[in-house]
């Protein structure tokens, strides 16, 4: 017990989205991980649902908080003092927390680690995807492109505020004072393209998942593959079914199980009927526990994404079950797959190549083993804790060099 009290106290900062998402799960998992290892893990959170209850004046004040929030600054400083915080770990800050959290921590002499879940520092809509295609106009031509296309929440006014805030804090070199966690090396390289952040301040640390209780031997699995995700064009669901027509008509014998709902669901049903596909099953929404069990019974998880993705947890969940992943060679998702080792990759725009890739599963026992080995080495809770502590230690050491007493 005495050793646990010596662990650095951490303040986790997060602005919860109106629709719960993967970032919320990551915050909860990291809090539990820290507490399991004896850290005091305090929370400073806001919730975007607060906006719907605000009056006009409060909404104006909260919008200005994208530049600097006095409330955030005061409350975070108070929390650091009251909880004797050694390090502040930030996740999402928009729109209610804002960059003031960084200045509050730095004013208290406490280092800041920012997990980068998306591309918001480079792209106001955070996903590098617009109007049905990948878009990096803001990095190549300037942030004004986002205003033209109303990229933040579909609002020109809100996009203007987001762009002005980003430009202000770039000019103030706010972002150069932080330490960063990116979830993949692909994301790290995108972040460093900003040319404001020292490369030594950016570390790669993926998310983690708990392993399944049992693993089904690859040879004993059902003759099926599974898609788990939103039925949306940017997720590649149309490309997948177009590939499946080729696969099924060429004599392929596997079954495709599709788990999820979304705007393309009606199209999927109509397409299955029109093309008379017999080996495809639409299951609709499937809870995570059932989806993971299904992955563990299947020959592969298919991820035909058409955008860069953030960090698809389904990939790590598949690895934990020794399930290979067939994935488009694109962005963060593609960077997580080692072709022929943990899964198979195909060109993101080629239904023909995806259909051909399915045939590689006939001899994938070694790939199943490679997926499990990769999970055990990189994506367990214990591996994640070691990675996290190395990042925290580096951040606190550099902070101590600037302000020795503040890291005690």
Predicted region positions:
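Acidic donor-binding loop of glycosyltransferase active sites
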Residues: 296-310, 323
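Short hydrophobic beta-strand element within catalytic cores of glycosyltransferases
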Residues: 315, 324-327
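Carbohydrate-associated surface elements
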Residues: 186, 208
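A short, well-ordered alpha-helix in the C-terminal region of glycosyltransferases
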Residues: 365-390
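Nucleotide-activated donor-binding/catalytic signature segment of Leloir-type glycosyltransferases, i.e.
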Residues: 269-289
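Conserved acidic donor-binding segment of nucleotide-sugar-dependent glycosyltransferases
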Residues: 339-340, 344-351, 359-365
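Membrane-proximal helix-turn-helix segments that form the acceptor-binding/catalytic region
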Residues: 107, 135-180
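A conserved mid-protein helix/loop that constitutes part of the nucleotide-sugar donor-binding site
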Residues: 24-25, 223, 227-246, 263-269, ...
């Amino acid at each position: 017990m005495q050793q646990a009290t010596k662990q650095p106290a951490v303040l986790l900062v997060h602005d919860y989205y109106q629709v719960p998402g993967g970032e919320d799960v990551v915050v909860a998992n990291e809090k539990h991980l820290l507490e399991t290892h004896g850290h005091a893990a305090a929370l400073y959170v806001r919730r975007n649902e607060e906006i719907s209850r605000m009056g006009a004046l409060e909404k104006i004040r909260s919008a200005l908080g994208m530049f600097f929030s006095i409330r955030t600054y005061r409350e975070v400083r108070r929390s650091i003092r009251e909880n004797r915080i050694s390090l502040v770990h930030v996740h999402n800050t928009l729109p209610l927390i804002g960059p003031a959290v960084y200045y509050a921590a730095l004013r208290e002499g406490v280092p800041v680690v920012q997990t980068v879940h998306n591309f918001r520092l480079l792209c106001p809509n955070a996903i590098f995807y617009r109007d049905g295609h990948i878009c990096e106009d803001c990095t190549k031509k300037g942030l004004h492109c986002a205003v033209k296309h109303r990229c933040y929440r579909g609002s020109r006014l809100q996009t203007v505020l987001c762009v002005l805030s980003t430009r202000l804090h770039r000019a103030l070199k706010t972002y150069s004072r932080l330490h960063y966690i990116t979830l993949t090396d692909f994301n790290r390289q995108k972040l460093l393209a900003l040319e404001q952040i020292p490369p030594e301040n950016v570390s790669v640390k993926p998310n983690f998942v708990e392993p399944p209780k049992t693993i089904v031997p690859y040879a004993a699995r059902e003759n099926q593959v599974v898609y788990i995700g939103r039925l949306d064009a940017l997720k590649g669901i149309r490309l997948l079914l177009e590939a499946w027509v080729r696969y099924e008509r060429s004599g392929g014998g596997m079954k495709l199980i599709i788990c999820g709902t979304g705007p393309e669901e009606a199209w999927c049903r109509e397409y299955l009927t029109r093309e008379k596909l017999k080996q495809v099953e639409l299951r609709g929404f499937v809870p995570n526990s059932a989806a993971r069990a299904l992955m563990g019974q299947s020959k592969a998880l298919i991820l035909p994404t058409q955008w860069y993705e953030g960090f698809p947890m389904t990939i790590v969940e598949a690895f934990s079950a020794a399930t290979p992943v067939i994935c488009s060679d694109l962005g963060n998702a593609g960077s997580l797959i080692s072709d022929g080792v943990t899964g198979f990759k195909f060109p993101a725009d080629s239904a023909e190549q995806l259909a051909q890739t399915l045939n590689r599963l006939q001899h994938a026992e070694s790939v199943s083993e490679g997926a499990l080995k990769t999970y055990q080495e990189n994506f367990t809770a214990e591996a994640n804790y070691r990675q996290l502590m190395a990042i925290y230690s580096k951040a606190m050491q550099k902070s101590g060099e600037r302000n020795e007493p503040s890291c005690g």
